[in-house]
Amino acid sequence: SLYNAVNQSNYKNPEDLEIVTLENAIYMGIKNDLAFIMDTNLYLYEHQSTYNPNMPLRDLFYICSEYQKLVDKKSLFSSTLQKIPAPNFIEFYNGSTVISDCTELRLSSAFECLTGEPKLELIVTVLNVNEGHNADLMQHCSMLKEYAQYVARVRHYASDMPLNEAVKHAVDECIREGILAEFLTQNRNEVISMSIFEYDKELE
C-alpha cells in the first residue's frame, strides 16, 4: 500500500515486486533501507528521523553496489548495451526539523566549485510523513497515517513527562484508540525501546 500511495498506482499482486536488499532493523513496521524492483524500476525507500543532507551521497554508494550485483560483469565488455533498472530514491522523513511536504536533495549540492551543469546527479525525494503533512499520501496508506499519529503523541507527552513514561503512555493510548493497535500490542516492549532510542537520537 505504501508503494501504491507514493506512486498513485493500484498494484495488488505481491509477486510483481522483487525485493533486492534489506538492511538494518524493522522499526515501527516500516523496513529501513528497502530496495525493490517494480516494472523495471529500482526503488530505494529509506526512513529518517533526523534531517540528513548527505542522503544523495549515501544513496550513490548504495545504488552502485546494487548495480554491481545485478549486472553480469562480463557483459560490460560486449558491444551490446547492458540495460539496468531506472533508480528512484524516496526518503520518508519524520524528524522535528521543519521541512515542506515534499522536497529534493541533490548530489550536486555537495560538489565543490561546481560550474555549469553537473556531470553526475542523484536526486532524493524527501516526503514529510509527520502528522499534518502529505494528507493525500496518508489517506492512501493508513499505516503511515497511524504511524505519524503515534510519533506525534510521543513528542507531545515527552514535552511534559519523562521520555520513558511518555512513550508508554502514547503506546497505551494508541492501542485503546485503535491506532496501530495490533502492531503495538504484539510488539509493545520492542516499540517502547526503539521509540526511546529514536527520540534520543533525534535530540542529539
Predicted feature descriptions by range:
Residues 1-204:
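Elongated, amphipathic alpha-helical interaction scaffolds
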